[in-house]
């Protein structure tokens, strides 16, 4: 059962300028292994985080580092959660994430589907 969906689009050049103007932003938004990525990839990962927050109904007090993206051996993105995001994920019964990322025309877009098994929600 689909619990929530989220989509977000990020202007890559604008995001890169924000990272340059605010050096601590990289540390606030990303876990250590994400911080080393190119701005294009960081913009896409931030879009995933925003889309996941929308799919979970933006948990109050969400800490951006409590969700991160990794890629499997085929390059497919996977969303991981801990802390504030994982608590909201459990409360909503989400046990599977579906993530799609694309880049084109200077933009990065992410679409996230939060899925739960029937009857697994806490409400």
Swiss-Prot record:
InterPro entries the record matches: 4-PPantetheinyl_Trfase_dom, 4-PPantetheinyl_Trfase_dom_sf, ACPS, Ppantetheine-prot_Trfase_dom
Binding site for Mg(2+): 8, 50
GO molecular function, one term: magnesium ion binding
Coarse class of the protein's main subcellular location: cytoplasm
Protein's UniProt name: Holo-[acyl-carrier-protein] synthase
UniProt-listed Pfam families: ACPS (PF01648)
Lineage: Bacteria, Bacillati, Actinomycetota, Actinomycetes, Micrococcales
UniProt similarity note: Belongs to the P-Pant transferase superfamily. AcpS family.
Reactions that this protein is recorded to catalyse: apo-[ACP] + CoA = holo-[ACP] + adenosine 3',5'-bisphosphate + H(+)
Presence of the UniProt keyword Lipid metabolism in the record: yes
């Amino acid at each position: 059962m689909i619990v929530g969906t989220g989509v977000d689009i990020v202007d890559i050049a604008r995001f890169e300028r924000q990272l340059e103007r605010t050096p601590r932003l990289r540390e606030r938004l990303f876990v250590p292994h994400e911080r080393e990525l190119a701005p294009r990839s960081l913009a896409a990962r931030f879009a995933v985080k925003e889309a996941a927050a929308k799919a979970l109904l933006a948990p109050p007090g969400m800490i951006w580092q409590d969700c991160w993206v990794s890629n499997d051996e085929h390059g497919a993105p996977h969303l991981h959660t801990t802390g504030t995001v994982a608590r909201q994920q459990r409360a909503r019964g989400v046990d599977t994430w579906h993530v799609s990322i694309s880049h084109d025309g200077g933009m990065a877009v992410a679409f996230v589907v939060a899925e739960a098994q029937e009857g697994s929600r806490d409400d």
